[in-house]
Amino acid sequence: MTPAPQARNLLHGVTLEAMVTELVAYFGWDDLGERIQIRSFNLEPSIPSSLKFLRKTPWARDKVEGLYLYMQREKARTAPRKIAMTTPPDHPTTAPFGSWASPVSAALIAGATIRLGQIALHSSTVAWSEGRPQDQGRNVVVQRSADGVLRDLNPAPFDVRTRAHEYGGGAFLLHGSELLFSHDGDQKMYRIGEASVAGEPVALTTSANMRYADAVVDSARGRVIAVREDHSHGSIDAVATLVAISLRDGAEQVGTEQVGTEHVCTEQVLASGHDFFSTPRLRPDGQQLAWLAWDHPNMPWDGSTLWLADVAGDGSLVDARVVAGGPSESIFQPEWSPGGVLHFASDRTGWWNLYRLSGLGAEASGEPLCPMEAEFGQAQWAFGMSCYGFDGRGNIVCAFTQAGRSQLARIDASTLQLHFIATPFCTITDLKVGADFAAFIGGSEAAPSAVVRIDLLTQRCEVLRSASSSEVDVAYVSRAEAITFPTEGGLQAHALFYAPVNPRFTGPPGEPPPLIVMSHGGPTSTATPAFNWSIQYWTTRGFAVVDVNYGGSTGYGRDYRARLAGQWGVVDVDDAVNAARFLAERGSVNPARSAIRGGSAGGYTTLCALTFRSFFQCGASHYGIGDLEALARDTHKFESRYLDGLIGPWPAAQARYRERSPINFTERLSSPMILLQGLEDKAVPPAQAQAMFDAVRAKGLPVALLMFEGEQHGFRRAATIQRALEAELYFYGRIFGFTPAGSIEPVAIENL
């Protein structure tokens, strides 16, 4: 991590001892050792012994200097700015937990944050999508030129989002000076750039029943190849294919029922016959196409196949064959090297590791590149996910997860040796690689996530765009403590614990703080230690938070994911309860004032915990599942057989669905709850929240329900985000008996 020459003047006069001392104080011994990848540094936790090692090791000193410069930039960047409070007093005020005044307001989270999404590269430019809550959640593609100029590529009201698989992803790509994208309003594909008329996007497709994603350009044939979902017969019966969409055909005409200009293009079906397709990737010479496919009842992280076909003269595919994968092997992100060698990630050994295809025809096989107990892949909830790419020399630049943290690295193309690239980020997603640089979304523990560009020669990181225009004083930031705790069956599970932090306040003497248990979505998702405004919202008010990576979460290998097979509503709930018990037993939290919250699948875990366990005093379900039978009958195609693996085949296992549905056992409920739901949610229909509310109200327990117009599965609008957070805080205040600081609109709570 050698500092750039222009930055070395910042090191002038700073001794190595001073650097190490300050770094240790900032990061801690273990974290510092991990960041600079020096094992002996961790093993010799004293400054004198570390200095002795560093002075004998120039490359290690370079890493320390680079990290020291980053730390100084972070300190300057995270200094009190827009939302800083006055200097904390020498003696903090004693006040009830939950009532502390916080600089992290719901309005700030809703209005000053954006959702950073897909990244794309073209030459030396970087582009990314950002969802803007203040613009009704509209998604805009922003491009940064080589000279640092930012500009929006899609004009209002165009919203770059595809609803393929409902969760979308892979909604745009760059083609020379053009942007090709899916528009949320009609799900058509558009182009804007040289072919545009008066700067207006031109429609490439015509049917509103089609959805497109994960497109790649076939320049030689003047077309794009994309995944297409045909919803002509409804969401549950959507037909997936790979199609080629011409960029040359058609006549331009002004559309009358949609914004923009319509450009009628022909579409050629290239591959069909599977329930799902993703990740079409064209060999650099255009002669072969690779893609992924899978079928019910599998999800892509359960089992998928990697296909390879030759591209014929007329553009069709011939000799299509499976080269990797199967019903119990998950393949992730096929990519071609610059030399035309197909690479991919597979979990055949229990971990998503990288492979390259060697041999021809029936003799083709996957050669492991760097076997290790780490994840070079992710649960493919969205299109376009990326964990690796190739630099200008053919080396692999990759991001992998190990022990819950991301690490950037380079795999030498000739020796297959893995070399760590030191960065200050604990999560790295959507990695895209150029000739001598890479870009990714990086999350650190003390600052909001950001689009980051890293120079692969100097290893210097540059933040191109932060997810937040506001930053909180680091004195208010609670950093994650990774915990491993015992759970059912003699097993261990993982979580991230956040203690309450607010330098202006302290809780009543001898009283541990209340606890909020967070259960992530998916359930095949993961909690990361990256800075999260929503977590800081609670910790700065006096709550402790534990974000649980229950059995079934990604990032810990296939066996850990498989713990949830047939056990959803059991294993996840056990782990949530046991995480809370572990913290209570060590004295970190008050078990008599504990809540559980979660969204989507995490909302189901929340409702199950409140129904089938008696540990928590209240909970908050954000678009959570209360009726598994209703979900099995009324959902979209992508998840329509998901429950086969989590619960059992439907309807053969109908009895188990009923046994695991909280809606059927409201007589067991003894804890209040608040339910928050979008009225346009297709993944978890609003009828589920209404039914749960009616049942809890009839039971006589305190319950609140907030329905939000225009919201889908996950809240996107600023007003909704703010109202949901404040409503939940108000609810906890009424249940736990504290008055939140500031002015919050009351919530109607039945039976209270």
Model-identified regions with their sequence ranges:
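Residue-level detector of Asp-centered blade-edge/turn motifs that repeat once per structural unit
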Residues: 121-123, 174-176, 218-220, 284-285, ...
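Cap/lid segment of the alpha/beta-hydrolase catalytic domain
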Residues: 297, 467-592, 599, 633, ...
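Long, compositionally biased intrinsically disordered regulatory segments in eukaryotic proteins
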Residues: 1-83, 87-88
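Non-catalytic accessory segments flanking enzyme active sites
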Residues: 115-120, 130, 151-152, 213, ...
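A flexible loop/linker signature enriched in serine peptidases of the S9 family
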Residues: 130-140, 160-166, 181-189, 206-212, ...
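Active-site-proximal cap/loop segments of hydrolase catalytic domains
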Residues: 548-752
